Amino acid sequence: MRINHNIAALNTLNRLSANNGASQKNMEKLSSGLKINRAGDDAAGLAISEKMRGQIRGLEMASKNAQDGISLIQTAEGALTETHSILQRVRELVVQAGNTGTQDDTDLGAIQEEIANLVEEIGDGSGKNGISDRTEFNGKKLLNGAFADGTATLTFQIGANKAQKLDVNIEAMSSNALGAVDAVTGDLVAGQAVADIDVKQFAAPTPSLTFDQQLDIVDGAIKQVSNQRSKLGAVQNRLEHTINNLGASGENLTAAESRIRDVDMAKEMSEFTKNNILSQASQAMLAQANQQPQNVLQLLR
């Protein structure tokens, strides 16, 4: 029997330290809910998890961006709904004015007065108080041609990574930009915009714009607004599907990241209980090991 080196006590102390360390790690994981709290816990898992977290947060922001894009489109489309309503009324008035057999100059003047007010409400894009001038989203004027094709684009970042964007154009929807369109070039016919409508000319023997021409102006304007609303509706539908896809991708990626980083509480609690029992047993055995050298005294009596 040796008393200078108590090997049994040293072995038991090492096991006690190991069990206490394991218990502390168990408690750390249980209190944080994570099985990776530092790089030393799982270096590769931490790197993968952090990359996934960046992607998840990017997907969440992309979804918010798409929602903001829908809000912008709804703002523009709502304004165009009113523009449509105005143009339908203008068409009705042009048809009424075309009944020159029962209209005199006073009647045509009254009709033109209402048309002029309606056209003014559409706005001429010059910044005055019309729908095309005051329709804006976060300071961006949407219907004055600022984002027409070939001018500028509204860019929506709808993905978590680069090159995942959606560019949108909104043509000018002002009274100077809406009207009769050349069937060949697709351009607005000069002098035949909604702003040029003047039904008082119907009283003249040779009006500069005949009834047929002025009706074509309104019909062309209605078609232009319809086309723009259709394009905006298509973009809105796309963004809604984008949001659904981003949500599904984020959900799946979150589940994958959780499997890497989150702790299994039941399993970890079992490990903690085991290590705690082993620690208590080690303490008891250490006391026994420390008692063994005392037995040497029995030999010295």
Which residues does each predicted region cover?
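Primary detection of the long, small/polar-rich alpha-helical "axial" segments characteristic
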Residues: 1-301
